[in-house]
Every structure is written in C-alpha cells, then in structure tokens.
C-alpha cells in the first residue's frame, strides 16, 4: 500500500510539473531576446535559463531556448519584434 501511494505521488508530481511549466525563447526584462552562438553547447543559454528558474537551456536558431520555465516567465511571441 505504501509503495502504491509513493508511486501515485511521483506520477502526480511529474504531471503537475509538466502542466505548470513552459518552454520557449526567454525574453529579458528589457524586452530583448538573449542571442547566442550555436557553438555555445549549453554554456551561456543554460546559465541564462537557470537564472529564470528553468530546468535547462540551449542555443536554438541563434537565441536562447529554455525548457521547464515557470508559468510567470516571459517568452517570445511569434508576431512580436524584440530588440
């Protein structure tokens, strides 16, 4: 019984974490995208994304992409211009 409860709690945590997080190009407080180099291999972007409480980050199409951001994080919208 104890194992079933622990397993249920684990599944709920995974589901809720996925529901309450989002992915995207992070936007700074100055409304700018973080630019990066494809050769960066997680260094710069991962550090930027972690500052915004994301799970991880990497360079994607010359901009920092973050995985697992909190819902309050500001991410880029498709038809909007950023500095």
From Swiss-Prot:
UniProt superkingdom: Eukaryota
Free-text comment about domains: Has the structural arrangement of an alpha-helix connected to antiparallel beta-sheets by disulfide bonds (CS-alpha/beta).
Transmembrane segment boundaries: none
Organism: Lychas mucronatus
SMART domains recorded: Knot1 (SM00505)
Name the UniProt record assigns to this protein: Neurotoxin LmNaTx3
GO biological process, one term: defense response
Keywords from the named record: Disulfide bond, Ion channel impairing toxin, Neurotoxin, Secreted, Signal, Toxin, Voltage-gated sodium channel impairing toxin
